[in-house]
């Protein structure tokens, strides 16, 4: 796994969603607990590429995800991308992201988890995880400053580069570097 540091979790979501090759991706599942930073980013790409967004099924009380119903959803309509918050910023509900990601991987879906409300607070290990991209914000449960965010890139799926520019390495090459994460972090970041 590698870590990419854009300036916020919102930019991280845009870099991930924008880096997906949408030509072969038609079905996206989201939890009903998503932050608007995630949903607005996803909606932008839905308008561009016309894929379907479906909410993951809730239990009878409407308060938690129903993993059995979700498995049936995936059987009926194969997931290409699954997007989930790790923790709801409204209710505090901790979603079963590992379990749902494992179900999604049975269909080779890309799994993105918004961990902005969780990283630093809820234990997570991506070492053997089915999660491809884990997004975080420095100013929330990591208690850092505004203007830092990122994502843990734990995937074989190669994202297209969304932004081009200086990287401080391989300067004679006009293509963005493909190795590591430097190609996803062009320009000079804020430093304190």
Q: Where do the language-model regions lie?
A:
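Pyridoxal 5′-phosphate
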Residues: 1-192
